[in-house]
């Protein structure tokens, strides 16, 4: 194709555009037409419809409820910053919940010891929880903490509460985080815990948080459903001139 040639529009993209217009006139929770109905309406193969619906699912415009497809809520906006998931959800008028998967006792290998600033072989607490918003599973969070720094945490911490708030209550201030974000597909276990299709694209956020003395607080791995979450960042120039 030459630079001046018009791009080829695939049939499922035409159907997708029509379905987007249809969705604009529907309300959250409304049932969406079945594949067969859409195929008959637009006189296309059902495989074409499946491709269009797949894109709508990934973009979070529709969601599956059993065998029914319905109009989805808008994606949850998660600001990139030191705030917690709970704080972000509440700021949008949503309820944030957590389901306990497991507490685990680990020992730090060389890599984890370097990240957390502890000795090799030091005890590490691991907390794994499913994140929910208004009852919908949207993320899987795995946090590793130096056990000696948080005595009694497993016995006293309410797993449905914000871990950040609990850590702050112990006099520890979050002053810096180092985040990396990738895309990933869930493995079978992760997909089952999130109630998602194994082909659903995910955001993978790895974070190390530091306190006022620049000592590591935690190492966190968060897997977020790409069809339910989106990330936002606000950037400020250090001076008035921005050179591109």
UniProtKB/Swiss-Prot annotation:
InterPro entries: Bact_HTH_transcr_reg, Chorismate_lyase_/UTRA_dom_sf, Tscrpt_reg_HTH_GntR, UTRA, WH-like_DNA-bd_sf, WH_DNA-bd_sf. GO terms for molecular function: DNA binding; DNA-binding transcription factor activity. The keyword NAD does not apply. Transmembrane segments: none annotated. Keywords: Cytoplasm, DNA-binding, Repressor, Transcription, Transcription regulation. Residues 35-54 bind DNA. Represses the phnDCE operon, involved in the uptake of phosphate, under conditions of phosphate availability in the cell. This is HTH-type transcriptional repressor PhnF. It comes from Mycolicibacterium smegmatis (strain ATCC 700084 / mc(2)155) (Mycobacterium smegmatis). The gene is phnF.
């Amino acid at each position: 194709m030459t630079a001046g040639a018009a791009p080829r529009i695939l049939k499922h993209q035409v159907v997708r555009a029509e379905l987007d217009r249809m969705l604009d006139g529907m309300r959250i929770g409304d049932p969406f037409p079945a594949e067969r109905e859409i195929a008959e309406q637009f006189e296309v193969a059902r495989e074409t419809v499946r491709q269009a619906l797949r894109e709508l699912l990934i973009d979070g415009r529709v969601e599956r409820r059993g065998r029914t497809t319905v109009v989805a809520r808008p994606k949850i906006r998660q600001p990139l910053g030191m705030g917690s998931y709970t704080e972000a959800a509440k700021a949008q008028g949503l309820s944030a919940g957590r389901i306990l998967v497991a507490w685990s006792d680990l020992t730090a290998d060389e890599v984890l010891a370097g990240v957390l600033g502890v000795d090799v072989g030091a005890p590490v607490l691991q907390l794994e929880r499913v994140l929910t918003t208004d009852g919908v599973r949207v993320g899987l969070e795995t946090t590793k903490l130096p056990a000696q720094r948080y005595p009694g945490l497993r016995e006293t911490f309410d797993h449905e509460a914000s871990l950040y708030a609990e850590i702050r209550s112990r006099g520890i201030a979050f002053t810096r985080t180092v985040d990396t974000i990738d895309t990933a597909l869930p493995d079978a276990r992760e997909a089952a815990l999130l109630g998602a299709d194994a082909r659903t694209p995910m955001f993978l956020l790895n974070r190390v948080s530091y306190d006022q003395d620049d000592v590591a607080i935690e190492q966190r791995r968060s897997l977020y459903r790409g069809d339910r979450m989106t990330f936002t960042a606000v950037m400020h120039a250090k001076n008035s001139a921005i050179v591109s």
